[in-house]
Amino acid sequence: MGCVQCKCCSRYPSSSSDGDSRGPLEANGVLKGKDQKPLGSIHVPSPNFDMVYSVLSQRGYYPDSPDKENQDTYCIKTELQGNPNVHFFGVFDGHGVLGTQCSNFVKERVVEMLSEDPTLLEDPEKAYKSAFLRVNEELHDSEIDDSMSGTTAITVLVVGDKIYVANVGDSRAVLAVKDRNRILAEDLSYDQTPFRKDECERVKACGARVLSVDQVEGLKDPNIQTWANEESEGGDPPRLWVQNGMYPGTAFTRSVGDFTAESIGVIAEPEVSMVHLSPNHLFFVVASDGIFEFLPSQAVVDMVGRYADPRDGCAAAAAESYKLWLEHENRTDDITIIIVQIKKLSNE
């Protein structure tokens, strides 16, 4: 992403997810330095069901930067606006030199804006979009230099028996759906990257060059698309570049911050979806792309579904992701996962 100059970041805390692992998995497969919170539970009075949740965040393993901090952070806020039926879960994946400061800033301000918005229950989608766009402007105007730093965000707002999902970037939310004797993964968000034809065309219309690193460096023909899809692509995905420079090189098409990338179509407007919960919905997962880089949504749901305790599900998914990272690369990304189980929900 390149170096940037810090204006003044001392007032912004480090990530609440501060695992300090100095190396890969321990011999028994357990993550070192992980930050896992106690089991949490929420009762939703209307329509009378329970949620049980856990979160785990693991700092990435970077051999060349052993002291690199965890740029992921997360937020679990119960009873927004004092309403026992409204709850918020979010994961924020920072990037760039000041990614940690960006992810913490956005985490705090998004939930504050939603909490203060009188239209939240009347029109959650409108409230979501307003919050992210306003936070983006606040970040630009803050003491944090976000010219080449920012954060993605995946958030879930529970409003009674409905969940509203707002996505900015390439983190993901997935719902586990019981279908007879199977548990199926239903994506609640869709990664906003140049792999998506609609997003690729949108940023190109804004002036972005969409090329892999090898293409930008002249190792491959820039006029021939060298990537197929996200699952089959190796370690050289399509990225966004200005017309006459080798920056910013973002692998996503939406984020909060990234002021420089806005000139080539990177936007902070979230895509918002809604699902009406039913007894067939068992749990949902909210996680950074550190989880999903090498694990498809169905594999994550299969793994989490084996465990009665969401703490165990978090640990298993994080450990498997960590292992797969090291099998494919000599490092791992930061990894953050929230699992929320849905219990005692009836059709009545």
Curated annotation (Swiss-Prot):
Is the keyword Transferase in the record?
Answer: no
* Positions contributing to Mn(2+) 1 binding: D93, G94
Cofactor requirements of the protein? Mg(2+); Mn(2+)
Pfam family of this protein, just one? PP2C
Molecular-function annotations in GO: metal ion binding; protein serine/threonine phosphatase activity
Keyword Transmembrane helix assigned to the entry: answer is no
Enzymatic reactions? O-phospho-L-seryl-[protein] + H2O = L-seryl-[protein] + phosphate; O-phospho-L-threonyl-[protein] + H2O = L-threonyl-[protein] + phosphate
Location of the PPM-type phosphatase domain:
52-342
Q: What is its EC number?
A: 3.1.3.16
UniProt region (Disordered), positions on chain? 11-40
**Which positions carry the signal peptide feature in this UniProt record?**
none
Q: What is this protein called?
A: Probable protein phosphatase 2C 35
Q: Which organism is it from?
A: Arabidopsis thaliana (Mouse-ear cress)
